[in-house]
Amino acid sequence: DTIQFCRYAKMVSDLGANVILEVQKPLVRLLKDLTGVSTLIAKGDPLPEFDFHCPMLSLPLAFKTDLNSIPSAKSYLEAEAERVAYWKNRIKGDGIKIGIAWQGSHGTKIDIGRSFELKLFKNIADLNNVQLISLQKGYGSEQLRNMPQGMQVMDLGEELDADGAFLDSAAVITNLDLVITSDTALAHLAGALGIKTWVALKFVPEWRWMLDRQDSPWYPSLKLYRQEKMDEWASVFDQMQIDINSIPYGSI
């Protein structure tokens, strides 16, 4: 939610306010250069004096946001330049570089039905000129040790985001041609970075993805692939494979 709605800080700033933005401590470095923010503090740290307060997720209501007025900039976050350069060298190689993630936060109610198994990427991994790179952290990453025979996915290991939430993920994503992910924070991160991203959605997704549309008014760089039937992912990945095959090499 923070990555999606921190964009409203600029709108508040444009009204003439000095914006003090309080976010989860792990996100402070990621958001340190966010446009419109005068002071960025970690949740729980002492607050400076302020005149007004508004919960971040109430800002869409405060600005009377509707479908036609969603602030949908091409991008509003930027990865650290040194990390971008480091990961560019780390993942260098031929082919279309596709970052993948398949598992959301385990054991939470929101995760029911939204995650899928890594092995569903097998047919995409087998395509010519495709290099899959894992963006998965924590639970779910153990599937990298038990992939179908012949399936290759680059594992970035414990080094990824060792210094803070999403710092390396943002840098890796900046170097990718495409991200394919389940409905996780990585979808929001890639969208906020303006990187071409395909999101696989369960049959009844979260409210923010709406219904009956392939685009997202929140993130212009996203394309949504929806389940046709509950708990059925095969058709989603079949369509992705078709779409990748239809992309001329070098034009993604």
Segment roles from a protein language model:
Residues 2-252:
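Catalytic machinery of carbohydrate-active enzymes
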